Amino acid sequence: MSEKRPLILLPAVDVVEGRAVRLVQGKAGSETEYGSALDAALGWQRDGAEWIHLVDLDAAFGRGSNRELLADVVGRLDVAVELSGGIRDDESLEAALATGCARVNIGTAALENPQWCAKVVAEFGDKVAVGLDVKIVDDQHRLRGRGWETDGGDLWEVLDRLDSEGCSRYVVTDVTKDGTLQGPNLDLLGRVADRTDAPVIASGGVSSLDDLRAIATLTDRGVEGAIVGKALYAGRFTLPEALAAMGQ
């Protein structure tokens, strides 16, 4: 990539029973609640977001769904939405795409149902991103599925497989960092970006504007955007401050 592009910021709205929440390390039961999901999403739009990362955590954990609410949220927004959580088969994928979201993020299904994932990547192209939720154990990069409860194999093997199938984009999370405000795993992001030609979106750990500036140094290696959640909700910085820091 020759042209230096500003890092795209995607404020996260994680939804449990219709409310915006943040988890610590993706663990069910660690929620901090931040009010209505719709109000949160509209607030980020008002603050200048061009993208919203909208997650149905109930669907991701297999304990229900906020499908109708999320469709309403997408319909009320004028900005692009990346929709994630529990998209594991044709029916849930079609329902997600029918909301009018810009793209969907597939996680567990890419690990548990690789043939289906290959089919939808081929069929829907840029409308499908794959979430790579990584847990580093004894220097092994392992993928996690089912709301990070199950082992999904070796990161590098799965990444090479998805690349060969033409996956258009990856959302990369270090699950030990997510919701902790401990800073992103820049080494992991850089290594994934170097291994694939597809753009990478960073997720997890952002705690400060300096963290965003650090991720932005990886744009020429293929890191396209960063999902920001807890730091915004906890008031570490505002979205306008973050956009200004990214030159937007």
Swiss-Prot record:
<dbReference type="Pfam" id="PF00977">
    <property type="entry name" value="His_biosynth"/>
</dbReference>
<dbReference type="GO" id="GO:0000162">
    <property type="term" value="P:L-tryptophan biosynthetic process"/>
</dbReference>
<dbReference type="InterPro" id="IPR011060">
    <property type="entry name" value="RibuloseP-bd_barrel"/>
</dbReference>
<dbReference type="GO" id="GO:0003949">
    <property type="term" value="F:1-(5-phosphoribosyl)-5-[(5-phosphoribosylamino)methylideneamino]imidazole-4-carboxamide isomerase activity"/>
</dbReference>
<dbReference type="GO" id="GO:0000105">
    <property type="term" value="P:L-histidine biosynthetic process"/>
</dbReference>
<dbReference type="InterPro" id="IPR013785">
    <property type="entry name" value="Aldolase_TIM"/>
</dbReference>
<keyword id="KW-0368">Histidine biosynthesis</keyword>
<dbReference type="InterPro" id="IPR006062">
    <property type="entry name" value="His_biosynth"/>
</dbReference>
<dbReference type="GO" id="GO:0005737">
    <property type="term" value="C:cytoplasm"/>
</dbReference>
<comment type="pathway">
    <text>Amino-acid biosynthesis; L-histidine biosynthesis; L-histidine from 5-phospho-alpha-D-ribose 1-diphosphate: step 4/9.</text>
</comment>
<feature type="active site" description="Proton acceptor">
    <location>
        <position position="14"/>
    </location>
</feature>
<keyword id="KW-0057">Aromatic amino acid biosynthesis</keyword>
<protein>
    <recommendedName>
        <fullName>Phosphoribosyl isomerase A</fullName>
        <ecNumber>5.3.1.16</ecNumber>
        <ecNumber>5.3.1.24</ecNumber>
    </recommendedName>
</protein>
<feature type="active site" description="Proton donor">
    <location>
        <position position="133"/>
    </location>
</feature>
<comment type="similarity">
    <text>Belongs to the HisA/HisF family.</text>
</comment>
<keyword id="KW-0963">Cytoplasm</keyword>
<dbReference type="InterPro" id="IPR023016">
    <property type="entry name" value="Isoase_HisA-like_bact"/>
</dbReference>
<dbReference type="InterPro" id="IPR044524">
    <property type="entry name" value="Isoase_HisA-like"/>
</dbReference>
<dbReference type="InterPro" id="IPR010188">
    <property type="entry name" value="HisA/PriA_Actinobacteria"/>
</dbReference>
<dbReference type="GO" id="GO:0004640">
    <property type="term" value="F:phosphoribosylanthranilate isomerase activity"/>
</dbReference>
<comment type="function">
    <text>Involved in both the histidine and tryptophan biosynthetic pathways.</text>
</comment>
<keyword id="KW-0413">Isomerase</keyword>
<keyword id="KW-0028">Amino-acid biosynthesis</keyword>
<comment type="pathway">
    <text>Amino-acid biosynthesis; L-tryptophan biosynthesis; L-tryptophan from chorismate: step 3/5.</text>
</comment>
<keyword id="KW-0822">Tryptophan biosynthesis</keyword>
